[in-house]
Amino acid sequence: GALAELASKLKQTVLISHSQSGSFPLAAALIDPAGIAGMVLIEPGACPAAYTRDQIIALSRVPALVIFGDHLGDTPTGIPGFSWQTAFDGCQTFIERVKDAGGNAEMLHLPAKDIHGNSHMLMQDNNNLEIAGLILQWIETNAGKRKESHGTH
């Protein structure tokens, strides 16, 4: 779809998603990765485990950052059988699969950077500018390289 088409028109777009829309950049990259310089998935509800080897290889062509805060085990989701820890674990597995395929994928688990106290709504938390800075730094370091390799700035 529409997201892949928009990214293609915009050229070298970084797609950022949150929560339930977390897999939208991944789906767009599978349709047409040409316009996507990078993907940032903020607390995605899932990183699908059902991707085939060919799909993982396709996704490995687009740098990806997945971000989770520190509330993984203690926040009720209201969804039977779902936990943020399960989503985190699934995304960690996804990242390893992408790396194994030669891709650039990374987990930014905020407590590992000594950043604590975040909710699921990272962009609304008191330290949102610090988190935005980390995202921008990742984009500059990772997505920017892809952009330069295609001869655009």
Q: Residues of each region from the PLM?
A:
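Conserved acidic catalytic loop of the alpha/beta-hydrolase fold
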Residues: 1-14
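Extracellular/periplasmic catalytic domains that process cell-envelope and extracellular macromolecules
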Residues: 8, 17, 57-60
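Conserved alpha/beta-hydrolase fold motif
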Residues: 15-16, 39
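Gly/Ala-rich beta-loop-alpha elbow adjacent to hydrolase catalytic centers
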Residues: 16-25
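Active-site signature of alpha/beta-hydrolase-fold catalytic machinery across serine-
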Residues: 27-31
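A conserved short beta-strand
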Residues: 34-48
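Catalytic active-site module of serine/aspartate enzymes centered on a nucleophile-bearing elbow/loop
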Residues: 115-117, 121-153
